[in-house]
Amino acid sequence: MGPVMLDVEGYELDAEEREILAHPLVGGLILFTRNYHDPAQLRELVRQIRDASRNHLVVAVDQEGGRVQRFREGFTRLPAAQSFAALLGMEEGGKLAAEAGWLMASEMIAMDIDISFAPVLDVGHISAAIGERSYHEDPQKALTMARHFIDGMHAAGMKTTGKHFPGHGAVTADSHKETPFDPRPASVIRDHDMAVFKSLIAEQRLDAIMPAHVIYPELDPRPASGSAYWLKTVLRGELGFDGVIFSDDLSMEGAAIMGSYAERGQASLDAGCDMILVCNNRKGAVSVLDNLSPIKAERVTKLYHKGSFSRQELRDSARWKTVSAQLEQLHARWQEAKSA
């Protein structure tokens, strides 16, 4: 299993993509909206990807809900994380969050997709990149909601990815466009933001973690996603996390501080990442594959989905019908509340 996760251009594979997927360093593939036309096409694309690849790839997507949902038409419209507690309260919201985790994971597993990068564990709604993707501004309540969603995902047969360690919720800058700084004291970052990750790791509820492309100058001069302090000293050492560490997308402007694509990839692996994401830049991905030293990402093999059922079997179930309707309704209520 190789340590590189990359993407493909369209609805089906071209010859160059088949060649790239057969590279021994490729271990994962992430799907985007541009790869989706309809459920039958998506299922066929995943089949082509599995067919072309040398390794048994981890196929991933961002299908967390709210504004980050790559596949919409033909799938349940998932509400934003913030909406569960905000509109339903902690008890009712928690129950539906668990069902949302189950439904989201089930809809993806029916497509033979292994993981959706979820849940978001960032605390608070002020960040441009996070906002409504956060469950709550109170760490304890965010933890409770995330716990429900995670349990639903696990029940469906999907592994979880907590993001963005140690917490992206308090920075207003968007790391897709620049490298944000979080100048708050170390004690606040650790006791407020990191507390959610710490609890879920102790409970063994997180199978993977995606670190933030954020610099916390009070603790380390490098972005957490490329920092041995955050990934090795804190995450592995102090918190005892033994799951998969993903880099965030090395094509984001926030990662440019780490040099060329090959340098960014190597720096992320050296810092402690198991798998690096190189998306939306074919040249960058090829450069990483050409220049990275051969390495195996054994931990990543733990992320394959469990269960095998068709989309039709899922949609015929009473549980899916009930939960799908509830989630669509909450999504509509949330959109209305935001525009009021």
Curated annotation (Swiss-Prot):
GO cellular component: cytoplasm
Transmembrane segments: none
The keyword Cell cycle is annotated on this UniProt entry: yes
SUPFAM superfamilies according to UniProt: (Trans)glycosidases
Pathway annotation: Cell wall biogenesis; peptidoglycan recycling
Annotated InterPro entries: Beta_hexosaminidase_bac (IPR022956), Glyco_hydro_3_AS (IPR019800), Glyco_hydro_3_N (IPR001764), Glyco_hydro_3_N_sf (IPR036962), Glycoside_hydrolase_SF (IPR017853), NagZ_Beta-hexosaminidase (IPR050226)
GO biological process: carbohydrate metabolic process; cell division; cell wall organization; peptidoglycan biosynthetic process; peptidoglycan turnover; regulation of cell shape
Family: Belongs to the glycosyl hydrolase 3 family. NagZ subfamily.
Protein name: Beta-hexosaminidase
